[in-house]
């Protein structure tokens, strides 16, 4: 099937989907969750094909683990769909409004965006996560996963489409492009007459490719070169726990700490404690600021400047000593990705200065960067984390998958 045909079908499905209310959409979501559990064995057999292919291509164990589905993981994905069904539906919500002096009654109402194209890599759970969030908000979605998940994505979308059909919703509201040919992706990125938003979920290369080639608005995000600045007045013992959480809880995520900035005034006192604490947790520290004795530790390596602009996505941490808060802010402006940045301090005035001067989707005072997440922010599930400023910023929950329209009503009213 051609890309233009898929996009046309998605657009038509979005018109049909917009007519369904919250009850019907929730029924469809519950049907999807049930179908995932009922067809677990079938899904696992197909998933094994993707795992075998990944192993034959020498793909890393970390990526293979992301690809792998188990009965427990499928059950978790199904429960996530049920959780989406339990969330409040933003569609139809009146944001604000009133009656104007002219007598015109005006309301600003939330409505679906229309058609969303999501491009992602080796995460089959994203197929269901994004589909459920789009369906909840009345959007059609085109899913373009990586070649590593080709077979798994195909069966997951087939499960979703069957459940939609049984629930009386348009099954073509969820479609997949399983051919990894990049020329097809280029074609999709030009179909702005049918597709309303592109959400890439992957590395910096994928985001740059979409920005350079798309005529459709692209949500940029998910690249997390996140910093914590240990200011001179910080409680150093408690800071160690926050740093360890931000770095080690789940190193491969975009909200993980990648560079630690330490105030020069406390460096001699704090760096030995930091090394002792994090080396026990198997973290490798990359820095030129540790003492000669500490640098003998094989877990303390020289710092490569180029790494300051990259996500480690592993148990590695850059450590840089800075001369005060202004230098810390300048470092973040130079190397940060506008994702999540934090300060550890007991000085309220410096905390406010940090918040005002650091440009990021989420700014933290005395807390781990790991909280930048839709569920943690109380938004429910998230479709992505945006680091841009237009339309959406930070974790993108259901509201970020809507736009609004002005609804105006008069009594055969004319403008004077």
From Swiss-Prot:
CDD domains: ALDH_F18-19_ProA-GPR. The keyword RNA-binding does not apply. One of its GO terms (biological process) is L-proline biosynthetic process. Its EC number is 1.2.1.41. GO terms for cellular component: cytoplasm. Pathway: Amino-acid biosynthesis; L-proline biosynthesis; L-glutamate 5-semialdehyde from L-glutamate: step 2/2. It holds the Pfam family Aldedh. It is found in: Cytoplasm. It catalyses: L-glutamate 5-semialdehyde + phosphate + NADP(+) = L-glutamyl 5-phosphate + NADPH + H(+). Its main location: cytoplasm. It is an enzyme of class 1 (oxidoreductase). Keywords: Amino-acid biosynthesis, Cytoplasm, NADP, Oxidoreductase, Proline biosynthesis. It comes from the Bacteria. InterPro entries: Ald_DH/histidinol_DH, Ald_DH_C, Ald_DH_N, Aldehyde_DH_dom, G-glutamylP_reductase_CS, Glu-5-SA_DH, GPR_dom. NCBIfam families: PRK00197.1, proA. Catalyzes the NADPH-dependent reduction of L-glutamate 5-phosphate into L-glutamate 5-semialdehyde and phosphate. The product spontaneously undergoes cyclization to form 1-pyrroline-5-carboxylate. Belongs to the gamma-glutamyl phosphate reductase family. This is Gamma-glutamyl phosphate reductase. It comes from Glaesserella parasuis serovar 5 (strain SH0165). The gene is proA.
């Amino acid at each position: 099937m051609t890309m233009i045909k898929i996009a046309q079908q998605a657009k038509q499905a979005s018109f049909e989907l917009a007519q369904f209310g919250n009850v019907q959409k929730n029924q469809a979501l519950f049907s999807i969750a049930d179908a995932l559990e009922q067809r677990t064995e079938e899904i696992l057999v197909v998933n094994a094909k993707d795992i075998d292919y990944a192993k034959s291509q020498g793909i890393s164990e970390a990526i293979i683990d992301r690809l792998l589905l188990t009965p427990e993981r499928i059950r978790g994905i199904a429960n996530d769909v049920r959780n989406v069904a339990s969330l409040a539906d933003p569609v139809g919500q009146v944001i604000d409004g009133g009656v104007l002096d002219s007598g015109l009654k005006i309301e600003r109402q939330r409505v679906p965006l229309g058609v969303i194209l999501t491009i992602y890599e080796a995460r089959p759970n994203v197929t269901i996560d994004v589909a459920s969030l789009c369906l909840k908000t009345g959007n059609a979605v085109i899913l373009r996963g990586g070649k590593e998940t080709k077979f798994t994505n195909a069966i997951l979308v087939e499960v979703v489409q069957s459940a939609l059909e049984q629930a009386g919703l348009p099954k073509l509201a969820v479609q997949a492009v399983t051919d990894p040919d990049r020329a097809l992706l280029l074609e999709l990125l030009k179909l702005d007459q049918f597709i309303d938003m592109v959400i890439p979920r992957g590395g910096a290369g994928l985001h740059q490719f979409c920005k350079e080639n798309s005529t459709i608005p692209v949500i940029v995000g998910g690249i997390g070169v996140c910093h914590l600045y240990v200011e001179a007045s910080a409680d150093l013992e408690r800071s160690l726990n926050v740093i360890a959480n931000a770095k080690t809880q789940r190193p491969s995520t975009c909200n993980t700490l990648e560079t630690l900035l330490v105030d020069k005034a406390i460096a001699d006192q704090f760096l030995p404690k930091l090394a002792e604490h994090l080396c026990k947790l198997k973290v490798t520290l990359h820095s030129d600021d540790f003492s000669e004795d500490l640098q003998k530790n094989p877990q303390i390596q020289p710092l490569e400047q180029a790494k300051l602009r990259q996500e480690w996505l592993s148990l590695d941490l850059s450590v840089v000593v800075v001369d005060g808060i202004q230098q810390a802010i300048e470092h973040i402006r130079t190397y940060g990705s506008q994702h999540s940045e934090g300060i550890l301090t007991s000085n309220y005035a410096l905390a406010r200065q940090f918040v005002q001067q650091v440009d990021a989707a989420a700014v933290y005072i005395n807390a781990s960067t790991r909280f930048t997440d839709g569920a943690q922010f109380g938004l429910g599930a998230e479709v992505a984390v945006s680091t841009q400023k237009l339309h959406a910023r930070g974790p993108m929950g259901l509201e970020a998958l809507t736009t609004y329209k002005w609804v105006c009503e008069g009594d055969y009213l004319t403008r004077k």
